[in-house]
């Protein structure tokens, strides 16, 4: 499960 918040946070 990949959350968008985590994706942006990683960026």
From Swiss-Prot:
Protein family (similarity comment) = Belongs to the tachykinin family.
> Which Pfam family, just one, is annotated for this protein?
Tachykinin
Is-annotated flag, keyword Repeat?
no
Which keywords, in A-to-Z order, does the entry hold? Answer: Amidation, Amphibian defense peptide, Neuropeptide, Pyrrolidone carboxylic acid, Secreted
GO CC terms, sorted: extracellular region
- Role, per record: Tachykinins are active peptides which excite neurons, evoke behavioral responses, are potent vasodilators and secretagogues, and contract (directly or indirectly) many smooth muscles.
What does the UniProt entry say about where the protein is found? Secreted
Q: Which residues carry this modification: Methionine amide?
A: 11
Q: Could you tell me in which tissues this protein is expressed?
A: Expressed by the skin glands.
- Which domain of life, per UniProt? Eukaryota
**Modification Pyrrolidone carboxylic acid, positions:** 1
Give the organism, scientific name.
Uperoleia rugosa (Wrinkled toadlet)
This protein's name: Rugosauperolein-2
Q: Which GO terms describe its biological process?
A: defense response; neuropeptide signaling pathway; tachykinin receptor signaling pathway
């Amino acid at each position: 499960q990949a959350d968008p918040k985590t994706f942006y946070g990683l960026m």
